[in-house]
Amino acid sequence: MSDKIGLFTGSFDPMTNGHLDIIERASRLFDKLYVGIFFNPHKQGFLPLENRKRGLEKALGHLENVEVVASHDELVVDVAKRLGATFLVRGLRNAADLQYEASFDYYNHQLSSDIETIYLHSRPEHLYISSSGVRELLKFGQDIACHVPESILEEIRNEKKD
């Protein structure tokens, strides 16, 4: 029997504890789980890609079957095919997330009917955490330690020093 391989993607700008929870839970469902950082090289992100990747790798270091990869200018289904992933993992906080994700699921299925999308609901304590919310708190000098993994906090602090 072949390995079950999943792919969970996002911009992770920055990664939140909600992302971490979904990844930890998804890692138990698959033999291998790729976490794909998708970024636009023509758009200035909050954290540079290198910092995001390093922070994610540290935050996920305890998960032996998880590997962080980065991609740009590529469709998610093409990355999944390249990595041998037959499952896309998506986290849902609310009905708006489901509606947003459903349109991507439609197109992904049209492009590759072999790839299934699996939705994991956010835990109640993570329902209102978002990367954009964390960025907004940071903009106004607020503490975000309860919203992001320690390794991400370190990357943000290091980036602010520069």
Curated annotation (Swiss-Prot):
GO terms for biological process: coenzyme A biosynthetic process. It is an enzyme of class 2 (transferase). Keywords: ATP-binding, Coenzyme A biosynthesis, Cytoplasm, Magnesium, Nucleotide-binding, Nucleotidyltransferase, Transferase. Its EC number is 2.7.7.3. Substrate binds at S11, K43, V76, R90. Disulfide bonds: none annotated. The record marks H19 as: Transition state stabilizer. ATP binds at S11, F12, H19, G91, L92, R93, E101, H126, L127, Y128, I129, S130, S131, S132. It is found in: Cytoplasm. InterPro entries: Cyt_trans-like (IPR004821), PPAT (IPR001980), Rossmann-like_a/b/a_fold (IPR014729). It catalyses: (R)-4'-phosphopantetheine + ATP + H(+) = 3'-dephospho-CoA + diphosphate. Reversibly transfers an adenylyl group from ATP to 4'-phosphopantetheine, yielding dephospho-CoA (dPCoA) and pyrophosphate. Belongs to the bacterial CoaD family. HAMAP family: PPAT_bact. This is Phosphopantetheine adenylyltransferase. It comes from Streptococcus pneumoniae (strain P1031). The lineage of its organism: Bacteria, Bacillati, Bacillota, Bacilli, Lactobacillales.
